[in-house]
Amino acid sequence: VEDSPHGLLAASRSRANVLRVDNPKDLTLEKITNKLNENKSMNIPKWQGGKMNVLIPMAGAGSRFQQAGYTFPKPLIDVEGKPMIQVVVDNLNIEATYIYVVQKEHRAKYNLDTLLNLITPNCKIVEVDGLTEGAACTTLLAKEFIDSDAPLLMANSDQFLEWDSNEFMYKMIEQKVDGGILSFHSTHPKWSFAKVDEFGYVTEVQEKNPISDIATVGVYYWAKGSDYVKYAEQMIDKNIRTNNEFYVCPVYNEAIADCKKIKTFNINKMWGLGTPEDLKYYLENYKK
């Protein structure tokens, strides 16, 4: 709570939420909550930390939406006037080279090259024809673009996060980690999970097995994309699967065994957009 001009200016420059009231008695919980909800849509500067790659696989079948009568593929479903993939990219809020893995049949039919380049100019597009043996295999289709010393961020194409990408990236660089996992608190076995030691370093990750209450969001950072490629290929060579698929999160176990430093970064909330029910819940509740 601040009413001096200097204090208000400092609060604004620090990107604090500022609520002006005429009288201290007017400072109610309802007004604070409403102001915070309004500020969810404020423009936060994009993270601009130099050369970086963001990889978004968007080649899933989206069968739940098809069964519910949706005619467009999931990444193109309208979410408050924007294709879902644009909502996801805007929410990541990171200046980078974007790389998308798309279904071959969708690329031409829906003019994905034009659309994705409008959302993220000069992006890279990789085709997949049909299904792979898991998300890790899908991401490696983009190996030619990510197998380098440039940082890599991988994200799901069907979720919305309440987070600050600047804060996350600053933390990753400040702590000089080799990898970072966005997380939230849950014990539901539909998620992936991370276990950490007393210093906050990840000691183990498990897919669909709640080894802790630190659930992973589905956004994964690697200080070097080449590390991800190396350890993903190593995991696949060892045939380490979950439910007969190669997942992305367990790749960190290979890095941890190689003495790489991995940390988690907790966010306020993750909103799923990946099913008709999740999308409906988001649209009805996010800005309430």
State where each predicted segment sits.
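Short, charged/polar "capping" segments at the starts of alpha-helices
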Residues: L8, D26-L29, E105-L112, P189-K190
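Conserved N-terminal catalytic core of the sugar/cofactor nucleotidyltransferase
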Residues: N53-I56, R64-Q66, D78, K82-P151
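Conserved alpha/beta core of the MobA/IspD/sugar-nucleotide pyrophosphorylase nucleotidyltransferase superfamily
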Residues: G50-V54, T203, A215-K288
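Conserved core of the sugar-phosphate nucleotidyltransferase
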Residues: E162-N239
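Short beta-strand-to-loop acidic/aromatic patch adjacent to the donor-nucleotide binding site
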Residues: D149-F160
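Structural beta-sheet core signal
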Residues: R20, V54-I56, I99-V101, M154, ...
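A short, conserved beta-strand element in the Rossmann-like catalytic core
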Residues: P5, H106, Q159-E162
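Asp-based, Mg2+/Mn2+-dependent phosphohydrolase catalytic module
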Residues: V1-K51
